[in-house]
Amino acid sequence: MKALLLGAPGAGKGTQAQFITAAFGIPQISTGDMLRAAIKAGTPLGLEAKKIIDEGGLVRDDIIIGMVKERIAQDDCKNGFLFDGFPRTLAQAEAMVEAGVGLDAVVEIDVSDSVIVDRMSGRRVHLASGRTYHVTYNPPKTEGKDDVTGEDLIQRDDDKEETVKKRLAVYHEQTEVLVDFYSKLEGEHAPKYIKVDGTQAVEAVKAEVLGALGK
């Protein structure tokens, strides 16, 4: 199973990725992890990427795609892989097809912006322990205080409404063209396109995703 998981920040991709990788016995591949591993291993592509990152630049698509091809040739990918957060742009998706990297399925976890803003902006965290609450769905016993220690809860900068809205705008700008690209692909490179309502309960989303993937 060679699959790509799409979904806005806060759509619940991470949770579903764990279910998919466990069900098919495949690794989850993210470009961040891949870059770090290549840099640590000192591969030619890793060294080239490190130089660009050290200079504050963005790693070019040809380097990323070279790394992807190296990564998916490894033994743990013999049954497939799950791409998370890659390809991120139309240029990357087109380059992947040109490089002969095919996909069996593209899974989009679809959640409206208003629901994501509500989910993320309502999160509150106890920093010392990592305990997470939600003002609506999982509130602490005392407003603004951790249940165990009574210490203050904070809202992370990433979860502030304006930040969430900015991240969503970037996601839509970059990724909606991918949705369009994959849903229109034809021939041998055309993956099965699966769109799932991510506002359902986690187990319902899991059942729908795995069912559509043939598990």
Curated annotation (Swiss-Prot):
Pathway listed: Purine metabolism; AMP biosynthesis via salvage pathway; AMP from ADP: step 1/1
Where does the protein principally reside? Answer: cytoplasm
UniProt keyword terms in alphabetical order: ATP-binding, Cytoplasm, Kinase, Nucleotide biosynthesis, Nucleotide-binding, Transferase
Q: Which PROSITE patterns match?
A: ADENYLATE_KINASE
Its assembly, as annotated, is: Monomer.
Assigned protein family: Belongs to the adenylate kinase family.
What cellular component terms from Gene Ontology apply here?
A: cytoplasm
Which of this chain's residues are annotated to bind AMP?
31, 36, 57-59, 85-88, 92, 156, 167
Domain comment in the entry: Consists of three domains, a large central CORE domain and two small peripheral domains, NMPbind and LID, which undergo movements during catalysis. The LID domain closes over the site of phosphoryl transfer upon ATP binding. Assembling and dissambling the active center during each catalytic cycle provides an effective means to prevent ATP hydrolysis.
Subcellular localization, as worded in the UniProt entry: Cytoplasm
- Residues annotated as binding ATP are 10-15, 123, 132-133, 200
Give the matching SUPFAM superfamilies: P-loop containing nucleoside triphosphate hydrolases
Listed name of the protein: Adenylate kinase
Region described as LID: 122-159
Tell me, which GO biological process terms does this entry list? AMP salvage
Reaction(s) the record says it catalyses = AMP + ATP = 2 ADP
Q: What Gene Ontology molecular-function terms does this entry list?
A: adenylate kinase activity; ATP binding
Q: What does this protein do?
A: Catalyzes the reversible transfer of the terminal phosphate group between ATP and AMP. Plays an important role in cellular energy homeostasis and in adenine nucleotide metabolism.
Q: What is its EC number?
A: 2.7.4.3
Region (NMP) residue ranges read 30-59
Which InterPro entries does this entry report, sorted A to Z? Answer: Adenyl_kin_sub (IPR006259), Adenylat/UMP-CMP_kin (IPR000850), Adenylat_kinase_CS (IPR033690), Adenylate_kinase_lid-dom (IPR007862), P-loop_NTPase (IPR027417)
